[in-house]
Amino acid sequence: RTETMTLKNGKLLAVQEAMVRKIVSELKEFDNLYYEICNEPYFGGVALDWQHHIAETIVNAESSFERKHLIAQNIANGSTRIEKPHPAVSIFNFHYSRPPDSVRLNWGLNKAIGLNETGFDGSADSTYRVQAWDFIIAGGAVYNNLDYSFTVEHPDGTNVPDGKTPGGGSPALRRQLKVLKDFIHGYDFIAMSPQESVINSGVQEGATARVLADPGRDYAIYIHHGKPGFSHNSATPSPNPRPLYAVSSEKQQTTLFCVLPPGSYEARWIDTKTGRLEKTEKLKSSGKPHALASPPYREDIALRIQRM
């Protein structure tokens, strides 16, 4: 049993290869999927060379196909630096990477870094909305969360998680995640990279700011007030050895001092819960720090800056 997902599993390997080839063959016409080698291989003795073999089996099975698919590898819970990545793997997925250090540690790979499972942090929508925005604006490429609003009794996703479930989920959260999707797709995000030095000063104590930018052209800025170790809706540290991630709901106002190349820009503050435009201003940058005052907000807010 301990060698099921190793290259020492005897005749089982041929069955696994045949299964992979069958799946790849059946799905070859679909362009809305990628293949992940194995979920959470770090639990249960899944050998790295077996994972590489499965990736190579997918590549070989698709070699004659007109439409080829990306291959993902699930690396770790949390964040770690990837050593010796396999060339067939295009997406490196992490679970519970909050804060999103997995992106920073592996940015140099020039590959997609994903957060493809998060949960176990209570059921508040704000927690998973903030984790999603934080990861994507840090430069991440994939986000999804455990969603316990879908059950046998509520296949439409309207169940209200009762606290016994290790995560949240709701129609409201999914609407909020669409705001993130629409926000990031409003950019040529492939041309953007993390540029947190754009913010010269102004980030409040206890807040986090992310900047994704195509310098001189497009800037996506995100500010939030969430972190592990705080009781929900308070600033009281939790004694829990794996403290829940939670978001302060206190009223906030932020003035960022941003350094932009000389030119004319438009800055738009956006409500991450509704997508509503809260404030717009035009500015002319001299290349020195320029003050951008947010409207009042709670939990988090996004700022879109684009050259005019």
What are these regions (language model features)?
Residues 1-89, 100:
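Active-site mouth of glycoside hydrolases
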Residues 41-43, 75-79, 89, 100-131, ...:
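Active-site clefts of carbohydrate-active enzymes
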Residues 288-290:
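Short strand-edge motifs at loop-to-beta-strand transitions and within beta-strands
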Residues 85-92, 108-114, 136-143:
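Glycine-enriched alpha-helix->loop->beta-strand junction motifs that scaffold or abut catalytic
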Residues 35-37, 71-73, 92-94, 113-116, ...:
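Hydrophobic faces of well-ordered beta-strands that scaffold small-molecule active sites
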Residues 128-281, 293-308:
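Aromatic- and carboxylate-lined catalytic core of secreted/periplasmic carbohydrate-active enzymes
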